[in-house]
């Protein structure tokens, strides 16, 4: 049964990622007063399959001066981590019910940095290396904020277990009392997934394509798939943390429907932001984190620590 659940999770995740690419192209098209892809299949619905077929049937070219092992390992690692991150998410039941689910997600997502750094260094290209260094600095910096925000939320729920977060939010979504944290979390997830306006690692006008410039065909597709799977995963995590869905025991499918709708709305907001906002300058990106987000999150962490003590209400113990 576990193997079947794992296969279903992988297949549904890949299907969601494939159609997210189509939704993004359609949404960007309509926001720029054009149609977007509409040739392959009815209304362009088969476009993701055409893209996959084209990418995976091309010959993968490797630069002669690249480091072969790291060059091949990097995209495989990125894709594996993107799949692994889904295991503890409650949808409505997690594949593996970790007591430290949030800690597992935070630790595993940090490993993505290695795949980006390896790909940039192994490509033996200045553009790729600069893109990789930018991405690593950005992701490591914003993980500081994500960790502190998660710590504040954990002090409210009293557990690292994602199911306990849903129990905590049975009567009130955490986005209402913790809206400053939710806003900073959402902005940090944009930076963590390297999306507009924080897509400095693949600034087309400066770095052509960033860390994956020397990749083509299948390996490039693996990076591309990992990026879009991380976007959906981050929004699913945001839904669990701040928009916790009540779990009705009489009809569990209501949980899944509600969870999916909220995740889709947040993902659509990601795409809308890409169409609406220009790219940040690198110094603005770092100033936003170290001069604005970090002091604010530390202050709110102190608030989350002191308030339960002040009003004599400890969080639920597991």
Curated annotation (Swiss-Prot):
Q: Tell me what this protein is called.
A: NADH-ubiquinone oxidoreductase chain 1
Query: So what does this one do?
Result: Core subunit of the mitochondrial membrane respiratory chain NADH dehydrogenase (Complex I) which catalyzes electron transfer from NADH through the respiratory chain, using ubiquinone as an electron acceptor. Essential for the catalytic activity and assembly of complex I.
Instruction: Tell me what topology the record assigns in the membrane.
Output: Multi-pass membrane protein
The EC number(s) this enzyme carries? 7.1.1.2
- TM regions (residue ranges): 3-23, 69-89, 98-118, 135-155, 171-191, 217-237, 253-273, 294-314
- Identify the keywords attached in UniProt to this record, alphabetized: Electron transport, Membrane, Mitochondrion, Mitochondrion inner membrane, NAD, Respiratory chain, Translocase, Transmembrane, Transmembrane helix, Transport, Ubiquinone
Query: Which gene produces this protein?
Result: MT-ND1
**BP GO annotations:** mitochondrial electron transport, NADH to ubiquinone; mitochondrial respiratory chain complex I assembly
Q: What does the annotation say about its assembly with partners?
A: Core subunit of respiratory chain NADH dehydrogenase (Complex I) which is composed of 45 different subunits.
Q: Which residues form a coiled coil?
A: none
Q: Name one GO cellular component term.
A: mitochondrial inner membrane
Q: What broad class of enzyme is this?
A: translocase
Name the Gene Ontology molecular function terms of this record: NADH dehydrogenase (ubiquinone) activity
The reactions it catalyses are: a ubiquinone + NADH + 5 H(+)(in) = a ubiquinol + NAD(+) + 4 H(+)(out)
Where does it live in the cell?
Mitochondrion inner membrane
**Protein family according to the UniProt entry:** Belongs to the complex I subunit 1 family.
- Pfam families, per the entry: NADHdh (PF00146)
Species annotation: Papio hamadryas
């Amino acid at each position: 049964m576990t193997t079947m659940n794992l296969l279903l999770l992988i297949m549904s995740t890949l299907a969601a990622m494939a159609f997210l690419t189509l939704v993004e192209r359609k949404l960007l098209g309509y926001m720029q007063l054009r149609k977007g892809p509409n040739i392959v299949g009815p209304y362009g619905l088969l476009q993701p399959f055409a893209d996959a077929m084209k990418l995976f049937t091309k010959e993968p070219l490797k630069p002669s001066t690249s480091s072969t092992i790291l060059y091949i390992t990097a995209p495989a690692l990125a894709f594996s981590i993107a799949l692994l991150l889904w295991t503890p998410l409650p949808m409505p039941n997690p594949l593996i019910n970790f007591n430290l689910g949030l800690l597992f997600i935070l630790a595993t997502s940090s490993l993505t940095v290695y795949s980006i750094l390896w790909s940039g260094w192994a490509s033996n290209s200045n553009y790729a290396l600069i893109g990789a260094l930018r991405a690593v600095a950005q992701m490591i910096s914003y993980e500081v904020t994500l960790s502190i925000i998660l710590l504040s939320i954990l002090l409210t729920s009293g557990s690292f277990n994602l199911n306990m977060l849903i129990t905590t939010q049975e009567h009130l979504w955490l986005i209402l009392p913790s809206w400053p944290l939710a806003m900073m979390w959402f902005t940090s997830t944009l930076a963590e997934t390297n999306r507009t306006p924080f897509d400095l690692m693949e600034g087309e006008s400066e770095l052509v394509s960033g860390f994956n410039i020397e990749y083509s065909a299948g390996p490039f597709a693996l990076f591309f798939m990992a990026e879009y799977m991380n976007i959906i995963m981050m929004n699913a995590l945001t839904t669990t943390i701040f928009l916790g869905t009540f779990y009705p025991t009489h009809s569990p499918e209501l949980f899944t429907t509600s969870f999916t709708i909220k995740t889709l709305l947040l993902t659509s907001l990601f795409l809308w932001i890409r169409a609406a906002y220009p790219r940040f300058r690198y110094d603005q990106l770092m100033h936003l984190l170290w001069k604005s987000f970090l002091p604010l999150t530390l202050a709110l962490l102190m608030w989350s620590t002191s308030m339960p003590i002040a009003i004599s209400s400890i969080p639920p113990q597991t």
